[in-house]
Amino acid sequence: MGHQAQHGTDDTEELLAAHRQLWCHALGYVKSMALKCALDLRIPDTIDRCGGSATLGELLAASEISASNHDYLRRVMRTLTAMRIFAASHDPAKADDAAAISYQLTPASRLLVSSSSSVDDAAGASKENTTTPSILPNIAHLVRPNTISLLFSMGEWMKDESAASVSLYETVHRQGMWACVEDDAANRASFYESMDADTRLVMQAVVRRCPHVFDGIKSLVDVGGGRGTAAAAVVAAFPHIQRCTVMDLPHVVAEAPAGTAGLSFHGGDMFEHIPSADALMLKWILHDWDEDKCIKIMERCKEAIGGKEAGGKVIIIDTVLGSRADDDDDDKTCRETYVLDLHILSFVNGAEREEHEWRRIFLAAGFRDYKITHTRGIPSIIEVFP
């Protein structure tokens, strides 16, 4: 009997754990929307302007929220604190919640302070953000209604035989994502600001943690480099690179900021021709395309670089799925990359790839070898050699 009772207890514990797990995932959107709420109310900026710590009362005043609604904000902040977006402290000597509770920035929320916050404020503002790139435009773009709403139709889209050629985004919005970006000025601005913000952070990490990747390179082409944000970070960090070209579609490079030091811009189609250089760089490019198109892009890359003995290589900054589970943080990153895979599938029928899928593309395009360097974040650096 004792054994049966223990077995029953184990079953109950397992059921309750499964129940908790399902609720956690089913309500995952609430976490995204709590984050969006904090961005809408400019909470990170307010904390930064208050010197890195702000009371609930200060957040209420800055957000123009009525004191009668203070408990709503307290509960949102409690959730975001549990998510480690913010930190919180409590002064037991103060009875009023608005004065007793104060909130601080964490490494995550420091990334959400707008780029203008610290410089706009007078003395006393936190200076930590001056060396921390803001990814506020990127995160704000990811939690827009237009971004999230299309996921409601994923199941029905998968049943459609045309899904292989028509993305979920196009099915829902009657227009492909790239066309929407170009046809809508507000959407275009949001998209490029989002990409630039992400690029500043990723490239800061790349040039600091993996400088060896750029050793010996005298000429570089950033393929699909947009407005030159990634290339600018490279030439600033590595002055030995004598020639750096940003290649993208003509209408994209036409919007590049004028006078970017050390860069030239080339309008063209990467499926047709890529300018020659010692090395090529592709950041978040190949995950937008199916395998056949990736092979074609890599074939053009191979034509554009010299042999391995001359230092020729392709530098890919992208995700490698399922490659890191050495500790808890790496395991979380691994799970998050699978979510990113569904995100990119929904928008452009793209894919994040496992190492064997990357290898298949490289070999099919005529490359002989590659080396993967993992970062502590989502992207990895893949050096591909002819």
UniProtKB/Swiss-Prot annotation:
Enzyme active site: 287 (proton acceptor)
EC number annotated for this UniProt entry: 2.1.1.241
Gene Ontology biological process terms in this record: biosynthetic process; methylation
Catalytic activity reported: TRIBOA beta-D-glucoside + S-adenosyl-L-methionine = DIMBOA beta-D-glucoside + S-adenosyl-L-homocysteine + H(+)
Gene Ontology terms, MF aspect: O-methyltransferase activity; protein dimerization activity; S-adenosylmethionine-dependent methyltransferase activity; TRIBOA-glucoside methyltransferase activity
Xref: InterPro entries: COMT-like, O_MeTrfase_dom, Plant_O-MeTrfase_dimerisation, SAM-dependent_MTases_sf, WH-like_DNA-bd_sf, WH_DNA-bd_sf
Binding site for S-adenosyl-L-methionine: 224, 248, 270, 283
Expression across tissues: Expressed in seedlings and newly formed crown roots. Highest expression in the scutellar node. Low to non detectable levels in cob, tassel and mature organs like husk or leaves.
Enzyme class: transferase
Ranges in coiled-coil conformation: none
The entry's keywords: Methyltransferase, S-adenosyl-L-methionine, Transferase
Stated role: O-methyltransferase involved in the benzoxazinoid glucoside biosynthesis. Can use 2,4,7-trihydroxy-2H-1,4-benzoxazin-3(4H)-one 2-D-glucoside (TRIBOA-glucoside) as substrate, but not aglucone TRIBOA, caffeic acid, ferulic acid, apigenin or quercetin.
PANTHER family listed in its UniProt record: O-METHYLTRANSFERASE (PTHR11746)
Protein name: TRIBOA-glucoside O-methyltransferase BX7
Organism: Zea mays (Maize)
Gene assigned in the entry: BX7
